[in-house]
């Protein structure tokens, strides 16, 4: 129960009652609102709970006990910035943040390098220099965000880093579910309350620019009812009362309300109307190349503005979906096919296909190539999405009390148009073939044609030789061909396997691991770190050419060699074997070597080959696994998992002809 005095003064309960009275009016027009309000008040008093809350200021080490209803009123009155995880910040007018000034300066630096980069020829030295510098600025900004979660940081706060992460997740989910709704109308309604809330948002809009009759009018409530009932979570298990409520609400709608409900999130029905069909034909008849949705050509600006104005009024539902983070993660998606930390990857092919079949051949004055029309189609969709997301973020930041002058910095930009994307089951691990980057066509053979994210073969521990060869297989045999031929990929991997074996057994270092070795004191257990013991082994045997640490070096994988395996080599290498026996197997770390043997040998960064003494001790199979095994997730995505062979404490992997069907 909630105290009646608390109920009367709570702005949250007042808002709840107002919204519910509007919903009941949809179903029962002319209902006695005073009597209904009395019933709602009784319900909230008898069944509501005003839970306790705690407001904690980590900087000032202050705590204030409160309740949910009082906290809501406090937020409405004080207008703090609302961040993820129930975290609140004072805005920039009330408190100065030096670290925020640093972030803004670094963002300005990044924009400077991005702008200067775009003045250089794509792929030139100057272009790559400024691309690197803008990337460095981004890393510096992200480093500040990460530092806030580190207790040793001077401005450490218990909540800031988590709040930043959750705010980002919240905004990505908000934009992702909005894109999904706009492009494919796929979000489902999980309750009758979801449906009525959607209706209420449409009916409560204060002003519309266009008369509803500019589009084909929907006067039959049954058409609209079928559309919304089919979008309930489990239509086959709908309660009869839910269907009755939807039908009754729609029976009471005016012709205008039915029409506006029908076109909301119904993009393709909207595009099929004569008015919009004609605008799209006019756009294609301009024969204008459209490569950058952030910079619409002057010849298209008026058409795109008109198209957006109609879409914004009739199609866009500019409100947040409830539980959007969970919805985006669990509900079926047809438009947003990938979500990264700060990105939504949108599937534009259905939109392009629609324009091809419905518009391209109606634009009789269009003389563009197929690729130019594809780019035009994709960027029409992306330009609409850009404006839709800007409207959504404006509303979102306003509701979160972000100052208007700061809200513009919260944005999503369109950066890439891809022709193909290969996804893997592992989060944030994918490969794309880039067609356009920030308005510039990426030619075949460009260094940035292939964009690889998160794969092991692109990480620091993998030698550049194997990384380049595996990337080339992806580009030539997966991303460029219209159809992927698995046999060709396996043939390339088989040839690469033979090349690795030949290289390793002949003492070449092309396929060694690449390890970073720090000072031993930097590790909790340096005696078990491969980078440390590999350098120690080299420096012990070859003191005349020592490896200085800290450093990055190539590391040879050995078979876990113990003294009995080294004895046959004593005749040819007596001095080296004696050192190994005395300082390693009988040294201070002898327990480790008795169990594991010699597993790693570092090589100096002078290009020298693997010493002849160690050639028979190289673990060729483990070297193959550590190199080709980094390609495992790529092949698994194509239905060709690696075979595994377990021996002792190692799991060797190799490719066969087994398909995962």
Q: What is each of the regions a protein language model found here?
A:
Residues 1-661:
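Conserved acidic
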């Amino acid at each position: 129960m909630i105290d009646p005095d608390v109920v009367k003064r709570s702005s949250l309960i007042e808002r709840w009652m107002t919204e519910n009275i509007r919903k009941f009016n949809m179903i029962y027009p002319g209902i006695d609102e005073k009597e209904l309000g009395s019933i709602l008040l009784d319900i909230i008093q008898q069944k509501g709970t005003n839970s306790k809350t705690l407001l904690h200021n980590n900087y000032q080490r202050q705590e204030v006990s409160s309740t949910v209803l009082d906290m809501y009123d406090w937020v409405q009155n004080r207008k703090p910035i609302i961040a993820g995880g129930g975290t609140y910040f004072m805005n920039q007018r009330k408190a100065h943040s030096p670290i925020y000034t640093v972030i803004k300066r670094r963002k300005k630096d990044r924009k400077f390098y991005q702008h200067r980069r775009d003045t250089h020829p794509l792929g030139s030295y100057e272009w790559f220099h400024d691309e690197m510098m803008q990337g460095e600025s981004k890393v510096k900004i992200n480093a500040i965000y990460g530092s806030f979660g580190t207790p040793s940081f001077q401005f450490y706060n218990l909540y800031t880093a988590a709040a930043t992460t959750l705010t980002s997740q919240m905004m990505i989910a908000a934009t992702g579910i909005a894109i999904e709704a706009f492009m494919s109308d796929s979000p489902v309604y999980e309750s009758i309350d979801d449906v009525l809330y959607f209706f209420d948002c449409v009916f409560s809009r204060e002003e519309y620019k266009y008369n509803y009759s500019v589009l084909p009018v929907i006067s039959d409530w049954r058409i609209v009812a079928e559309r919304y009932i089919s979008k309930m979570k489990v239509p086959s298990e709908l309660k009869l009362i839910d269907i009755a409520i939807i039908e009754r609400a729609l029976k009471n709608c005016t012709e205008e309300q039915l029409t506006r409900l029908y076109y909301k999130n119904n993009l393709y029905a909207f595009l099929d109307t004569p008015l919009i069909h004609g605008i799209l034909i006019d756009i294609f008849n301009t024969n204008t190349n459209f490569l950058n949705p952030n910079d619409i050509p002057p010849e298209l600006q008026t058409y795109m503005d008109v198209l957006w104005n109609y879409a914004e009024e009739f199609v866009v539902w500019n409100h947040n979906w409830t539980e959007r983070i969970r919805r985006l993660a669990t509900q079926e998606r047809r438009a947003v096919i990938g979500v990264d930390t700060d990105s939504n990857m949108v599937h534009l092919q259905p939109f392009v296909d629609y324009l091809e079949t419905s518009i391209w051949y109606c634009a009789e004055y269009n003389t563009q190539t197929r690729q130019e029309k594809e780019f035009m189609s994709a960027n029409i969709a992306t330009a609409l999405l850009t404006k839709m997301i800007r409207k959504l973020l404006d509303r979102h930041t306003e509701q979160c009390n972000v100052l208007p002058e700061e809200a513009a910095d919260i944005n999503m930009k369109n950066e890439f148009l891809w022709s193909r994307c290969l996804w893997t089951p592992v989060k944030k691990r994918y490969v794309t073939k880039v067609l356009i980057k920030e308005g510039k066509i990426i030619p075949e053979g460009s260094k940035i044609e292939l964009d690889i994210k998160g794969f092991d073969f692109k990480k620091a521990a993998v030698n550049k030789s194997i990384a380049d060869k595996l990337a080339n297989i992806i580009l030539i045999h997966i991303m460029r061909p219209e159809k992927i031929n698995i046999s060709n990929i396996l043939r390339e991997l088989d040839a690469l396997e033979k090349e690795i074996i030949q290289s390793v057994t002949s003492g070449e270092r092309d396929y060694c691991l690449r390890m970073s070795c720090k000072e031993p004191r930097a590790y909790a257990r340096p005696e078990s770190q491969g980078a440390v013991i590999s350098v120690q082994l080299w420096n012990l045997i070859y003191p005349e050419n020592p490896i200085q640490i800290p450093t990055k070096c190539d590391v040879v994988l050995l078979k876990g060699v113990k003294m009995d395996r080294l004895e046959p080599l004593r005749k040819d290498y007596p001095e080296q074997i004696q050192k190994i026996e005395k300082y390693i197997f009988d040294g201070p770390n002898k327990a480790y070597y008795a169990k594991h043997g010699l597993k790693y040998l570092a090589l100096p960064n002078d290009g020298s080959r693997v010493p002849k003494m160690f050639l028979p001790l190289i673990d060729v199979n483990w070297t193959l696994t550590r190199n080709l095994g980094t390609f495992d997730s790529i092949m698994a995505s194509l239905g060709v998992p690696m075979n595994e062979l377990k021996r002792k404490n190692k799991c060797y992997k190799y490719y066969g002809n087994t398909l995962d069907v």
